[in-house]
Structures are given as structure tokens and as C-alpha cells.
């Protein structure tokens, strides 16, 4: 088994009206999150990782991807550490935004996610279980204004 690379992406899928798509994890019902996933060896760069994960987890391919130039480092939960090389305890997460024209029904991979919700950014921020995901969503209004709705 190849070990996972301890580098990942978090992609906040949103509309210009600041509605955010959240996905409910299949292995942890009740845990809601944005699109996430690990970099793979054949990904050309982190943007490629983000686009691959978007396609795999939601089927979404039409939108504007923006690198937020935001990086988080967090401890990998003990129950997931066997997926990584011995001694790896932390992951580096790179945050992206993905602007879509309207709320779109995602095509979920049932092995990964069992439900989806579009919520106003404040509600999405409260619903997500991950502190880094909450922080990213909290920055959405400023990023949309700063970049003219292309966050």
C-alpha cells in the first residue's frame, strides 16, 4: 500500500451570493465539510489536486478556481495515521475557493459523502466540523469583495 502524502486541499464551493456547498461524510454521518482531499503523486500541482477532488467528490467542473494562498497545518487524527508513513503526524492543507454561477446539485461519490447542503456562509460555517474549514468559510465575504466575486 502506498502511503498518503501529508499535503491536501480544502475547496470552498460557493456562489457569488455567498451560499456554500457542504458535504456530509459517509464514514462519519453528521460531519459536514467542504471538498477536501490529498495530493497524489501524479497531480501536476495543488490546483490540479483541487480540480481532481472537485470532480471526484461533486462532479463539478464548471466554475472559477482561486488559490486563496492560505495554508493550514493540523494534526492528523490518530485513527487515520496508518494511512501515512511512520512518524507522520501532521498534514499541510492548502485552501482554494471555487465559484459557481448558481447552487448546483453535486453528483456525490457514495463511498465518500451521503448528503449535500447549500447554506448561507454563516450557517455553513457553524455546521462544518473542521476548525480550518470554519475559518476558510469565515473569510469568504472578504475574499469575494476583494476579488470582485471570483474568490
PLM segments and residue spans:
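Short connector loops at helix/strand junctions that flank enzyme active sites
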Residues: 6, 34, 89-93
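Short, acidic/hydrophobic/Gly-rich beta-strand patch recurrent on exposed beta strands
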Residues: 22-25
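A conserved beta-turn-beta hairpin within the catalytic core of GNAT-like acetyltransferases
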Residues: 27-31
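NUDIX/MutT-family hydrolases
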Residues: 95-99, 106-138
Amino acid at each position: 500500500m502506498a502511503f498518503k502524502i501529508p499535503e491536501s486541499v480544502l475547496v470552498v464551493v460557493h456562489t457569488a451570493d455567498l451560499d456554500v456547498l457542504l458535504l456530509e461524510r459517509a464514514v462519519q454521518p453528521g460531519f459536514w465539510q467542504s471538498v477536501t482531499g490529498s495530493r497524489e503523486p501524479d497531480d501536476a500541482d495543488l490546483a490540479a489536486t483541487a480540480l481532481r477532488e472537485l470532480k471526484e467528490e461533486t462532479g463539478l467542473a464548471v466554475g472559477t478556481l482561486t488559490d486563496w494562498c492560505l495554508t493550514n497545518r493540523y494534526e492528523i487524527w490518530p485513527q487515520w495515521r496508518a494511512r501515512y508513513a511512520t512518524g507522520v503526524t501532521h498534514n499541510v492543507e492548502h485552501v482554494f475557493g471555487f465559484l459557481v454561477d448558481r447552487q448546483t446539485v453535486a453528483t456525490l461519490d457514495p463511498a465518500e459523502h451521503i448528503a449535500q447542503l447549500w447554506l448561507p456562509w454563516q450557517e455553513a460555517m457553524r455546521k462544518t466540523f473542521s476548525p480550518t474549514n470554519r475559518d476558510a468559510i469565515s473569510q469568504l465575504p472578504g475574499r469575494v469583495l476583494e476579488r470582485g466575486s471570483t474568490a
